[in-house]
Amino acid sequence: MQITADMVKKLREMTGAGVMECKTALTEADGDFEKAVEVLRKRGAAVAQKKAGRLTKEGIVTSYIHFNDKIGVLLELGCETDFVARMPEFKELAYNLAKHVAAMNPKYVTREDVPEEVLEKEKEIYRAQLENSNKPAAVVEKIVQGKLEKFYEEVCLYDQKYIFDDEKTVKEVVDELIGKIRENIRVTRFVRMRVGEE
């Protein structure tokens, strides 16, 4: 299929990706926009993987106060350069992530941040729940792993479904912006406060 400039322009408007990236994605997808978007998303994740080890010494701290003044969030979104820290897309992502934290109340940024003793306690609880199930040990361990995945989705920001697009996780949303701007971005930390909670 012939890839036209209008097709490339339309895909760029949809995704924000570069001209050549859009053209290549459309070529790979034989002009199918949905497939081209998927190609770009996969590439964004690949780019994010390559950039993951790079330091994020720049960034911003953003805040969100819920309309009733009962919940507030401070969130630090790190990046490699101050140029990216000033980009509207970067600031918008930081603010939306702060809103996400206010709504979903994660406890940790990534699953790697969950302390080992917390994981062991959760596994202990899951095994105790299955103690009298008469299931083989291997099956019990699979069930425990499945429950742990659910636990991560509840308490880890990056594993949660993004409230503004529940087709994606927060990590996928962050990875998409990494793929678009070609620079490492990461949520460094956040604090969520609610009136009356410690």
Swiss-Prot record:
Gene3D superfamilies: 1.10.286.20, DNA helicase RuvA subunit, C-terminal domain, Elongation factor Ts, dimerisation domain
GO cellular component: cytoplasm
Cross-referenced InterPro entries: EF-Ts_dimer_sf (IPR036402), Transl_elong_EFTs/EF1B (IPR001816), Transl_elong_EFTs/EF1B_dimer (IPR014039), Transl_elong_Ts_CS (IPR018101), UBA-like_sf (IPR009060)
Keyword Thylakoid: no
Coiled coil: none
Single GO MF descriptor: translation elongation factor activity
Ranges for region Involved in Mg(2+) ion dislocation from EF-Tu: 81-84
Localisation per UniProt entry: Cytoplasm
Keywords on record: Cytoplasm, Elongation factor, Protein biosynthesis
UniProt xrefs under NCBIfam families: tsf (TIGR00116)
Purpose of the protein: Associates with the EF-Tu.GDP complex and induces the exchange of GDP to GTP. It remains bound to the aminoacyl-tRNA.EF-Tu.GTP complex up to the GTP hydrolysis stage on the ribosome.
Family: Belongs to the EF-Ts family.
Protein name: Elongation factor Ts
Species for this entry: Pseudothermotoga lettingae (strain ATCC BAA-301 / DSM 14385 / NBRC 107922 / TMO) (Thermotoga lettingae)
Gene that specifies this protein: tsf
